Regions:
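Short loop/turn motifs that connect adjacent beta-strands in outer-membrane beta-barrel proteins
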Residues: 23-25, 38-46, 58, 90-99, ...
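Surface-exposed strand-loop-strand hairpins of Gram-negative outer-membrane beta-barrel proteins
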Residues: 24-28, 55-80, 116-122, 181
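Outer membrane beta-barrel transmembrane domains
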Residues: 27, 68-69, 223-323
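Residues on the lipid-exposed face of transmembrane beta-strands in outer-membrane beta-barrel proteins
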Residues: 37-39, 51, 83-89, 131-137, ...
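Transmembrane beta-barrel strands of outer-membrane/channel proteins
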Residues: 49-57, 101-109, 159-167, 211-217, ...
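Long, hydrophobic/aromatic-enriched structural stretches that serve as scaffold segments
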Residues: 74-140
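Residues that define the transmembrane beta-barrel architecture of outer-membrane proteins
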Residues: 75-83, 97, 123-131, 157, ...
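Detector for outer-membrane/organellar transmembrane beta-barrel domains
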Residues: 162-165, 179-267
């Protein structure tokens, strides 16, 4: 059967403040670094667990025109996150499809300095927990791989709909802009309907070319500590890859943008509502280990487009195993 997708938590989307406002950065539903390969395919029934590791740096805080914010021209932020997770697929069908339930709690360390002359500081703690429920149905068919020892290939179309929820975490401090930027948690609720598809072609190059797309609509509740209201964020995530036996190699990325202004005490943030746009792109490699009921994955992402947020790079490693 298909290897399980690596699941869950916030993509690295960190919004920079104007110098006079607290730093607010929206959590975003979905996996660390974004969904990618097999994103609409659920694993076979069973209980799965694993960990996702993230290392990332934000090195250029930009305004709505994509220009560096002068007061933040020396700002730098680095984070290391570990996200242990569980994902359960009951042995039952609902409307002809499978149901999946996932939960993750990110734990990490974040170091930063924001303003010129400000010292570097670090914070460790627990981030925003994330839960997701999915329904997936395949219109395709399983066929054997051309390579011995590999999972069968699910050729054809698979669709998914679901709902994700980000919970306010416990490590949060809004006392200063720096402490807020360093907080592992964002202290806001996020309710996110999601949907997408995975399509795998017949074996043309190797075992088949796969196209996966996921969409998240992030709806935020006001941060009660700062009275900052983050505008809705739409997030389109994708991967184009080739199945080659136990390997899967390709390109992945995401494009996220806000469709509403950010507000403070109900007033839009000048001059442009601080509407964020962020796109990242990079390579991905997955390796299945059927003998151990597990898979590992690594990808690297770098910013290709940004407004009212940061230019950044990230490396994401994931491991999953069926218990």
């Amino acid at each position: 059967m298909q290897g399980a997708r690596l699941l869950l938590t916030a993509a690295f989307i960190c919004a920079a403040s104007t110098p006079v406002l607290a730093v607010e950065g929206p959590s975003a539903a979905g996996p660390i670094g974004g969904t990618d390969i097999r994103s609409a395919v659920l694993p076979p029934p069973g209980l799965y667990g694993g960990v996702i590791l993230l290392g990332a740096e934000a090195f250029d805080f930009v305004d709505g025109n994509g220009e560096t914010i002068p007061a933040l021209r020396t700002a730098h932020l680095a984070k290391q996150i570990a996200g242990p997770f569980l994902y359960a697929v009951p042995d039952a069908k609902v409307l002809g499809g499978s149901i999946g339930l996932g939960f993750i709690v990110p734990i990490g360390n974040q170091c930063a300095h924001l303003f010129i002359g400000e010292p570097r500081n670090c914070t460790s703690g627990v981030g925003d927990p994330y839960a997701e429920i999915d329904w997936s149905h395949s219109f395709g068919k399983l066929r054997p791989s051309k390579f011995p020892g590999a999972y069968p290939i699910l050729q054809g179309l698979t669709i998914l709909v679901g709902f994700g929820m980000v919970f306010p975490g416990v490590t949060y401090d809004a006392s200063t802009p720096l402490q807020q930027a360093l907080s592992i948690s964002n202290n806001i609720w996020d309710f996110a309907p999601t949907g997408g598809f995975t399509y795998t072609t017949p074996p043309i190059l190797a075992d088949g070319t796969e196209i996966s797309v996921r969409f998240f609509w992030n709806n935020y509740i006001e941060n009660r500590d700062t009275h900052y209201q983050t505008g809705d964020l739409l997030d389109l995530e994708f991967a184009v890859s080739e199945r080659i036996g136990r390997f899967q190699v390709g390109v992945t990325g995401f494009y996220a943008f806000q469709v509403e202004d950010d507000e403070l005490f109900g007033v839009p943030i000048p001059p442009d509502g601080r509407r964020t746009t962020n796109a990242q792109l990079g390579p991905i490699v997955n390796f299945d280990m059927p003998a151990h009921n597990s898979s590992v994955k690594i990808k690297a992402l770098t910013t290709v487009l940004t407004e009212n947020t940061v230019k950044a790079w990230a490396v994401v490693f994931g491991w999953i195993k069926k218990f």
